[in-house]
């Protein structure tokens, strides 16, 4: 399986989970390293756009393609098991992710996207023994269409 993420070109050649460990994220509190990825390039793009400040900021990013072999174990947080309006409650989602990641039972945690609930993000646990089987396939520049930043009249 190939998964995708955008990262600053300074860090696009490494898989460490340091950024999420330092800052926390949707599914992890600070202190727990994790590498956030998405099942498609378009979902990875939506995830990064939700947090981007400007087109100039995006132009510093590269698209990473990460190869996860089929032998890697996976655990899933299912949408139907989450409480109503879970996507507004960072404490709740961080607790859910922490429960899985801290036990170190799996190298891969499948979670619903808070933006597109029917699609999935994959959290890679760099502390799991099977992490060594996961490989960075490529890191390439990505063209972010300027229309993404035009003011919309809706």
Regions found by a protein language model. Give the residues of each.
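Short proline/glycine-enriched turn/loop segments at secondary-structure junctions
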Residues: 53-55
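NAD-dependent ADP-ribosyltransferases
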Residues: 15-28, 35
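Active-site and NAD+-binding cores of ADP-ribose-processing enzymes
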Residues: 2-16, 29, 57-154
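Extended catalytic/binding region for NAD+/ADP-ribose chemistry, centered on the ART fold
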Residues: 27-47, 51, 123-127
């Amino acid at each position: 399986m190939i998964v995708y993420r955008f990262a600053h070109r300074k860090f696009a050649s490494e898989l460490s989970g340091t950024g999420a460990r330092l800052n926390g994220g949707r599914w992890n509190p600070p202190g727990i390293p994790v590498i956030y990825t998405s099942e498609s390039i378009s979902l990875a793009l939506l995830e990064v756009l939700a947090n981007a400040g400007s087109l100039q900021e995006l132009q510093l990013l590269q698209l990473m393609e990460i190869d996860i072999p089929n032998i890697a174990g996976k655990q899933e947080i299912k949408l139907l098991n989450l409480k109503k309006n879970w996507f507004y409650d960072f404490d709740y989602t961080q607790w859910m992710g922490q429960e899985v990641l801290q036990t170190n039972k799996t190298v891969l945690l499948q979670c619903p996207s808070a933006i597109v609930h029917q699609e999935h993000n994959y959290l890679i646990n760099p502390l799991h023994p099977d992490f060594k089987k996961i490989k960075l396939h490529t890191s390439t520049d990505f063209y972010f269409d300027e229309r993404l930043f035009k003011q919309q009249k809706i």
